[in-house]
Design a protein with these regions (language model features):
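Hydrophobic core residues within well-ordered beta-strands of beta-rich domains
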Residues: 1-3, 75, 93, 107
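HotDog/MaoC-like acyl-thioester-processing domains
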Residues: 14, 86-133
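Generic structural detector for well-ordered beta-strands
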Residues: 8, 20, 82, 127-129
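Active-site- and interface-proximal helix/loop "cap" or "latch" segments in soluble metabolic
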Residues: 38, 43-57
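Residue-level signal for pocket-adjacent positions within structured domains
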Residues: 22-23, 27, 32, 70-71, ...
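Hydrophobic beta-strand-centered segment that forms part of the acyl-chain substrate-binding groove
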Residues: 52-96, 121
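Catalytic strand-loop segment that frames the active site of acyl-thioester-processing enzymes
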Residues: 1-38, 42-43
Length: 133
């Protein structure tokens, strides 16, 4: 599963990515019947895919050879997230990740997810690291 439709901005300091949650996504069936909302764990995964995985691959590519990057896997290690809104089926979200630190293949990013109307849905810090495949 991939929760990035498009990367809008990407440099050594930040990433901005967008995703539209499909109305027929399987996780809506039981969460919640008659009033589906996107589970928090899916929102964290969405932010991690942009703010840790995609951002991390970019940062690795600045420091390591293409072969080393190809043989690296980014694993999610830590999350501290506050939720302040909800994401409904069909909503488009924009996730921003800002670099807090990157060294020894370890990345920590400040992340934030917003709806198209600017409402902040969740924010916090996520961490991950590159490991050999």
């Amino acid at each position: 599963f991939r929760f990035i439709d498009e990367i809008i901005e990407l440099d050594s300091e930040h990433i901005v990515a967008q995703y539209v949650f499909p109305e027929d996504a399987d996780f809506y069936r039981g969460h919640f019947p008659g009033r589906p909302i996107t589970p928090g764990v899916i929102l964290i995964e969405t932010m991690a895919q942009a703010g840790v995985v995609a951002f991390g691959i970019y940062l690795y590519a600045l420091e390591f050879s293409a072969e080393e990057v190809e043989n690296m896997l980014t694993v999610f290690t830590d999350a501290s997230v506050d939720f302040s809104g909800q994401v409904l089926p069909g909503d488009r979200v924009t996730t921003t990740g800002r670099l807090k630190f990157f060294r020894r293949k370890k990345l920590k990013a400040e992340v934030e997810m917003r709806l198209d109307d600017g409402t902040v849905v969740c924010s916090g810090e996520l961490s991950g690291m590159g490991v050999p495949r």
